[in-house]
Amino acid sequence: MTSVWSEAIQHKDLKQWIQEVAELVTPKDIRICNGSDSEYVEIYGLMQQSGVAIPLNRDVHPNCFLVRSSPEDVARVEQFTFICTKEQKDAGPTNNWRDPEEMRQELHGLFRGCMRGRTLYVVPFCMGPLNSPFSLIGVEITDSPYVVCSMKIMTRMGEEVLKALGTSGSFHKCLHSVGVPLAPGEKDLAWPCNPQHMRIVHFQDDSSVMSFGSGYGGNALLGKKCVALRLASYIARSQGWLAEHMLIIGVTNPEGQKKYFAASFPSACGKTNLAMLKPKIPGWKVECVGDDIAWIRPGPDGRLYAVNPEFGFFGVAPGTSATTNPNALATCTSNSIFTNVALTPDGDVWWEGLTSQPPEGLIDWQGKPWKPGGAPAAHPNSRFTTPVQQCPVLDPQWNSPEGVPIEAMIFGGRRSETIPLVYEALSWQHGVTIGASMSSATTAASVGEQGKLRHDPFAMLPFCGYNMAHYFDHWLSFASNTSLKLPKIYGVNWFRKDKNGNFIWPGFSDNLRVLEWIFRRTNGEESIAKKTPIGYLPEESALNLEGLNLSTQALQDLLSVDVPGWLKEVANVREYCKIFGSDLPQAITDELFRIENELKIIK
């Protein structure tokens, strides 16, 4: 089996690893992926022949296809996601911990013979611009052609990565299988998966990933959450940088001044919408560097610089429309993969929110005729996978090896009460406390109950690869480096509701009005803010509200300090932080006491 494929691999350790894996999983053949367009077309063709991929109408969506997953494999599975470290305390209370050696033994049992009857694909990939100091190279071994096609879109993948790796470069070993071996002559499932034995496992001792049983996005595209966040956050701590669940945008004002912001929101809370925002206010421009992950390093001038390590967008489809995100729709017009959306009779895609009325004759995400009034036609976590270069508002510096300088960091969540529209941290320590205090109503991006409020510090709860309290400490440590020019930190909340349960703020493109205030604050405008215990809030006259029909009461709700609500908030955060015990940094404890004491004074 070795002689045919090994000619493409010059790296001795990589060649040896592929051979070891092949002996364990016993595939029918091995293919080294070169990342070419012709390879993509060929593998997509194989998926089409087997019934996995449904080609879409070429007049509407050229070179696009639809894939339907198993109903048992539709989202991230946090309960089956593990961090393996030598000591349990290094994983911390927010991660599922397992002993690395015990877990390796268990996984070797699961992987033994698991690719029988399937092709083993070797997918070399790079997270971050090639030959950038930011970048990490990985190699994913998988038996899923869907993963190969998705990795072609989501990462820099193939021959150019092998060339950059050379004969001795370091790489992250990422092993994936759907976990369904095939007997000779056995017909394959449309979406093979093994939900009873799902495992997504991160080994921090050798910076590797093993994923078994799921073919869904974040569980199977191992460059994304697994390498770019769970492994990278662990590496970043030891090397003095940050790997964050953040979008990156460039914002230009009417005078031509440009600033870059990074913003952190839990999954399905509007990151992609903000990253591709189409301003209503004349003269302003927002350009997208990335919509999901940011790697942030101190630059030679003391500023923090960020890159988007990804090469594509993996966006939530429901709710995306010409009104909410026209740029996202334009991005995924061609060369894209749609997963678990509905299909129209003329070969187009549809999902809830795309149009006000569903077209007739829809086939739902499970391949069944759909009738209005029942279950959604598209799964709530249905996705589009699309190349970043197709984004009409892509920032010119999106692929810069040095990254872009960040002047503001923004933290937000889905909160119906208490949290104001926007507020600025009083200090870096306070800003870290804002990030650590984040909570949000849960969404369909992960398996579990939706709409329940859960704490999600820095929107990293599912993605931090080590003890979250140590992660807070790492953030705080940046303030002790006096050579750094740290960005200002902000909290935002687009999701406040009135007493009737209606959203107060229009959101979407109108969020630029908040970005405009942040922009002015980073320019040092003092008079547009008032100091409060929770941070600097906008003066009501400082927000550009032209064209909005906001009542005085609505504006007051958005921009005032709800003292009883905030006292409850502080108590709630303090109670949550008990899970970290003595590992919780004293600075966060002190900041919570400061906020509480100052609130009691104005009460």
Swiss-Prot record:
Disulfide bond sites: none
Annotated GO biological process: cellular response to glucose stimulus; gluconeogenesis; glycerol biosynthetic process from pyruvate; oxaloacetate metabolic process; propionate catabolic process; response to lipid; response to starvation
Entry's localization field: Cytoplasm
Signal peptide stretch: none
Cofactor: Mn(2+)
SUPFAM superfamilies: PEP carboxykinase N-terminal domain, PEP carboxykinase-like
Cofactor note: Binds 1 Mn(2+) ion per subunit.
Residues that bind GTP: A268, C269, G270, K271, T272, N273, R383, R414, F508, S509, D510, N511
Binding site for Mn(2+): K225, H245, D292
EC number, UniProt record: 4.1.1.32
Transmembrane segments: none
A GO MF label: manganese ion binding
Catalytic residue list: C269
Protein name: Phosphoenolpyruvate carboxykinase [GTP]
Source species of the chain: Chlamydia abortus (strain DSM 27085 / S26/3)
